[in-house]
Swiss-Prot record:
It comes from Salmonella schwarzengrund (strain CVM19633). Belongs to the GCKR-like family. MurNAc-6-P etherase subfamily. Signal peptide: none annotated. Pathway: Amino-sugar metabolism; 1,6-anhydro-N-acetylmuramate degradation; Amino-sugar metabolism; N-acetylmuramate degradation; Cell wall biogenesis; peptidoglycan recycling. This is N-acetylmuramic acid 6-phosphate etherase. The gene is murQ. GO terms for molecular function: carbohydrate derivative binding; carbon-oxygen lyase activity; ether hydrolase activity. The keyword Lyase applies.
Amino acid sequence: MNLGTLVSETRNPQTMDLDALPTPELVKRFNEQDTLVAEAVKATLPDVARAVDAAAAALKSGGRIIYMGAGTSGRLGVLDASECPPTFGVPHGLVVGLIAGGPGALLKAVEGAEDSQQAGEDDLVALNLQEQDLVVGLAASGRTPYVIGGLRYARQSGCTTVAVSCNPDSPIAREANIAISPVVGPEALTGSTRLKSGTAQKMVLNMISTGAMVKFGKVYQNLMVDMKATNVKLVDRACRMVVEATGIGREEAETLLKQTDFEVKPAILMALTGLDAAAAREKLAAHQGFLRAALEH
């Protein structure tokens, strides 16, 4: 593949004079380019929705969401995966981020790590990949060998696969069941795909993980009711969520949360139904953790 023909590698005619611009104009040019990202992502929403449903199906069948990428793309996957346990109360390892070159590549580039298809396969083998897992390959260029190797192995293993790229009709798209390709155009700094391409990938990952967790029962209304209250700020947020979801006073909310070890869902159910903590947990379990279903039945 001639990399120079990739949209993400071409020069942007709107930013040819970056090195001659005064600072206010310099940052204005970057901002003008960033405004294009949301529209590019909007054009991919039908495919993002398919990925959300596939991610939720993986979780409901006992599988995992596995992101894999190199460089910025890999770091974004690790970032999204690492936020899921504190945000949604899921165990570490339910959403996994793999980066070419291993964890050390998060802080320092590992030269050449992305160039091996076998490394992508090996990293999935090391995770004991199962067919109920969803594998999401991330590559702004759409041609990273590490990601191609991983997606190919995942598909051969019976997994549903998703490719996220910022170039149309990319090699990784051809390896995936679902292709998400927000074409954001040439970067303000030629080839620096940590810019618009990275922003677009982050937006897509936000929707995949959050949407999947909504459909996995981790959200009530728009509240992260399975959040782990692990510090003072989050204990306060837990209390506010109970108040906002039920209309009770803060003091009563705090009393209920103490009875549930600061778990928000059973506290809300207790406030709205009069159940005690044990009965509230039992009812939630009977409805697979979906608070709305527990309240309505």
